[in-house]
């Protein structure tokens, strides 16, 4: 048996590899910067490659098979964020466990395929803005003070306790209970002095009853008090938002109760969410967007006890993927974050800054939005959505990209206040999601809440294909990202299929026909919903809008589905090779391994396609970007997720697309 490589051996090997890349100054146990200035960090880099005084690469070793794990990678990335001095975080991160290499670009907050050489790192690294530098260093300090590698483990333990001993089943209901407790914790931080005005705890400060000590002291008597408190807080005006129907909704249904009945489990849950730093000081879960700019006037105490939203959101995302039961609606398969990130990065990379900052009253936007009055005219014109949103994973991915773009320092024409106001408006008006499962909508609201948004337009519908409220958004979306339900013959609603034949509404895939001969079309009595959702999403896009959609490979290759491909691209002229007709231009096709959705219970072979709705019927089909993702970052063994030693091809795929030739871009 081969002797297991030690961390020291890996460090020595890493030093040699860095030398081969041309780095001359390589320091072991490199002392990292303390942004708080109080000596509390006491953090070091196992190995640091520098160019003069400029920190370039931070290396971190890991035990065999551990390098692919998010907590290990996060620890290295946040160490790199501390950097060598004020304003000097490391630019790149390398995590290695002797079998697996993982490289990250700190400015892009993204995985990269390789490390740059010592001679070329400056050209490979984009300049880091001042506000981004402040953010990276402060967030890194927060991470190391709080040791947030424990958050996801706590979520797992809480779910098990709520499910097995708290009397809350099935598993999705247990997830809802955890979401409710997170919601109450966020409210406590936003309104620490809140006094209850109704229920059994009327007149008491919420902070007094939402504590493990109080619950243990009061026992079962505390349960109805907290149930009443949850009902009151859930219905506060600050957590209400009007959807496109004009109806108000709250984070949870207005009459949804807190279901935990076991006081010991409730106390345990409250205690577990009382996150503290190494000095025992409380850490906040909620982060105002101003803090993301890094230019708020904050005391050292406030600065040191913030938790960045990405840390909590990451933990909840990992937890949700591992626990969510896929038994609601037509099909509920949680899209892995690796796929979401790839699709979001590719699509937002093609969105112009002018589109993100456009107003509905702008000359080139008025026809699309037809605003009524000045207030409506001043709203963002950009609209992104997912009409099969499930737990909101694509909406979270879009929100992350929006924040990254809007808060970027390169917008020299916009003040910090302008950016914050605009981002706030975009959160309310630029994201839309719908789903037929109310449980999924509730989880989407929690997912968005943990990423800093509690007013997203999320709509419970009976059928996203036929919903009349969604009809009002036809022609308005800039971008749709989605993973719809699929399965041959799974959609059988006669009214829905009849509606998908309404050519006056721009719909036509309620028919099928032999490829090349639409005159022989026939009505479908049942259909794969994936094909129908292509049509519905195209209807919702503005001319020139983009759709990125996960599809079963049959739609892309089966002869019986050739009419769908023809509907999208048109028919190919045998003489010119050009496609005639068709509703869209295909930009990219990315084939996914059959393991991609295996944790969700299916090994179906899938791909995602990136198509752009034609602005004019004569728009030509341009060269298509094709890619194959044989590895998506993980393997599965039963219900467990294991790191893929071959890494994540989707990282390279997104980077290659964004760096592609102009005729593809």
What are these regions (language model features)?
Residues 57-61, 67-68, 77-78, 83-246, ...:
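Charged, often flexible domain-edge or linker segments that flank or initiate folded functional domains
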Residues 1-38, 536, 572:
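Acidic-basic catalytic patches of nuclease active cores, encompassing PD-(D/E)XK
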Residues 314-349:
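Class I SAM-dependent transferase core
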Residues 336-482, 487-494, 498, 552-554, ...:
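Conserved S-adenosyl-L-methionine
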Residues 183, 190-324:
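Long recognition/docking surfaces used for binding and targeting
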